[in-house]
């Protein structure tokens, strides 16, 4: 067991309680900060998903057509392939 030599017992107990209070408070602040950042990240993800859905609905282009258009190579363009 650790023996604390300096000061009285009540002073040592109060000091230990203060240290514990500071550590617990700091841990709570860090936890709250992490929770807020996670919630903010979830909100950003929701906004991006809504935007992607809205853009895909508004464009009127199917995903297969988008895929084919992204693979379009003007140097090897054959109009019969696209009819």
Swiss-Prot record:
Topological relation to the membrane, as annotated: Single-pass type I membrane protein
UniProt KW keywords: AIDS, Apoptosis, Host membrane, Host-virus interaction, Ion channel, Ion transport, Membrane, Phosphoprotein, Transmembrane, Transmembrane helix, Transport
Origin superkingdom: Viruses
Transmembrane segments: 14-34
Compartmental location: Host membrane
Cytoplasmic side: 35-83
The keyword Nucleus is annotated on this UniProt entry: no
Quaternary structure (record): Homopentamer. Interacts with host CD4 and BRTC; these interactions induce proteasomal degradation of CD4. Interacts with host BST2; this interaction leads to the degradation of host BST2. Interacts with host FBXW11. Interacts with host AP1M1; this interaction plays a role in the mistrafficking and subsequent degradation of host BST2. Interacts with host RANBP2; this interaction allows Vpu to down-regulate host BLM sumoylation.
Designated name of the protein: Protein Vpu
